[in-house]
């Protein structure tokens, strides 16, 4: 008679942004610690968890399709994540879903799993769960989420209604997690949240402790502490508060990467007011000039929305003029899309789709030209590159100016004598609108 017991298996689908990816990693870590096996196929799983995104309508549709696929292929499905905050919307399309929870409801998800697929008899000390937890990124970089929620009420966004107001993680916990990641071989930490520059606002920047030492709960203090770990530290989702100025000297000193992801959204004061975003374009241009004087190597990434309700040709021209003057390095642009529950839906003068498309094309054409010129300035220079891929044809990596998934790449043709996560010096030989080509020095 066999005494082998069945190890319960869970399928997992993770959608959406890096913040959602971190939530998925946390759930998967708990499941693995409890003895569940995580499998890549629907038909091998006892149950499937779908971690959804609900930020824009296309993300909602993708999430609903993923839920439907999991139901068709497996039948036992738990839904969590941002779209989970709209249970009625999910039930209307997929009434057979077993349970639905909102974002960062880790304990609820685990309780539901226990109910439908009981926990195995398991000794966690015999498991192979790494100390840093289960990660869905390559081993050499990882996302470090420092807070949940957001205190802003931008009219195009529904994140606060799904994830709530800002809740900062204790700085000691954040720094301990960062140390575990570095000890596990991570070479690049990507700091994320809904609003990274607001870190600690909700707790009045109280003093926390790490390794017995007092540390202020703030973005600047966090950056100073992370710089001691000796790895690349990259800041994402930074709202343009005045104290952002204080991290630029840290970048100039090489303590954190000279890279700032700062979503500006528009340049017309009138449109920014309708968006409920800060609206002084002249001040932003002056700050960008000052930042570059302090840190000439600074890479600026931003995102913008065209076709926002009420946007006139004059407003759009202000945006193009801003691009010409700011000469940002990395830029994303979205055509405004109504999101159920967003305040902007009630605004008058909705922009026709064909006008949005035409403005988006003009925006992208201008920014591609600027990006190509900025990258051409790097030809002939030596830069540091972290290796992301290696095959028989060569290696692909990223410079300090490139975040994974969203920015450009550096191609090292014929360079096969490197490993994932290696940081190598490269001489840039060629460039296009987004990418660089070079050879190892």
From Swiss-Prot:
Radical SAM core domain: residues covered:
136-373
Binding of [4Fe-4S] cluster 2: at which residues?
Answer: 150, 154, 157
Keyword Cytoplasm in the entry? The reply is yes
InterPro entries given in the database record? Elp3/MiaA/NifB-like_rSAM (IPR006638), Methylthiotransferase (IPR005839), Methylthiotransferase_CS (IPR020612), Methylthiotransferase_N (IPR013848), Methylthiotransferase_N_sf (IPR038135), NA-bd_OB-fold (IPR012340), Ribosomal_uS12_MeSTrfase_RimO (IPR005840), rSAM (IPR007197)
Q: What is the UniProt remark on how the cofactor binds and its stoichiometry? A: Binds 2 [4Fe-4S] clusters. One cluster is coordinated with 3 cysteines and an exchangeable S-adenosyl-L-methionine.
Kindly list the cofactors needed. [4Fe-4S] cluster
Q: Which family does it belong to?
A: Belongs to the methylthiotransferase family. RimO subfamily.
- Per its UniProt record, what NCBIfam families does this chain match? 30S ribosomal protein S12 methylthiotransferase RimO, MiaB/RimO family radical SAM methylthiotransferase
Question: Which catalysed reactions does the entry list for this protein?
Answer: L-aspartate(89)-[ribosomal protein uS12]-hydrogen + (sulfur carrier)-SH + AH2 + 2 S-adenosyl-L-methionine = 3-methylsulfanyl-L-aspartate(89)-[ribosomal protein uS12]-hydrogen + (sulfur carrier)-H + 5'-deoxyadenosine + L-methionine + A + S-adenosyl-L-homocysteine + 2 H(+)
Instruction: Please state what the protein is called.
Output: Ribosomal protein uS12 methylthiotransferase RimO
Q: SUPFAM superfamilies, per this entry? A: Radical SAM enzymes
Keywords, comma-separated and alphabetical: 4Fe-4S, Cytoplasm, Iron, Iron-sulfur, Metal-binding, S-adenosyl-L-methionine, Transferase
Where [4Fe-4S] cluster 1 binds, per the record, is at 17, 53, 82
This protein's GO CC annotations? cytosol
